């Protein structure tokens, strides 16, 4: 039996959209005791995630048809856990989702 990975699983790194990245930065930056510049945070994230556009991720999600898992957070979790867990997302089927019923 053939096993088809979602399109984003073919990347060497997990992916994150600019909107998801901004949500993580807005949530995490106030928590640092020593304020890191956003550029430094972006460099760290860029080492573990690849920033991609929303249409690329949306196309991959449409092809895999995992819409029942919740609202996509704009990040994959094939190799690295969801950075967007800081804003309520969790990993399901290699994609970070937020349960729309959670507050």
From Swiss-Prot:
Assigned keywords, A-Z: Disulfide bond, Knottin, Plant defense, Signal
PTM comment: This is a cyclic peptide.
Entry protein name: Cycloviolacin-O9
Family: Belongs to the cyclotide family. Bracelet subfamily.
Signal as UniProt keyword: yes
Function: Probably participates in a plant defense mechanism.
Crosslink position(s): Cyclopeptide (Gly-Asn): 70-99
Record comment regarding domains: The presence of a 'disulfide through disulfide knot' structurally defines this protein as a knottin.
Pfam families found in the cross-reference section: Cyclotide (PF03784)
UniProt keyword annotation of Signal present: yes
């Amino acid at each position: 039996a053939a096993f088809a990975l979602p399109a984003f699983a073919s990347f060497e790194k997990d992916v994150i959209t600019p909107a998801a990245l901004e949500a993580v930065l807005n949530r995490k930056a106030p928590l640092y005791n020593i304020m890191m510049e956003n550029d430094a945070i972006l460099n760290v994230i860029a080492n573990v995630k690849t920033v991609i556009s929303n249409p690329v991720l949306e196309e991959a999600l449409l092809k895999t048809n995992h819409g029942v898992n919740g609202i996509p957070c704009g990040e994959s979790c094939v190799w690295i856990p969801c950075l967007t867990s800081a804003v309520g997302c969790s990993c399901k089927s290699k994609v970070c989702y937020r349960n729309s019923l959670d507050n």
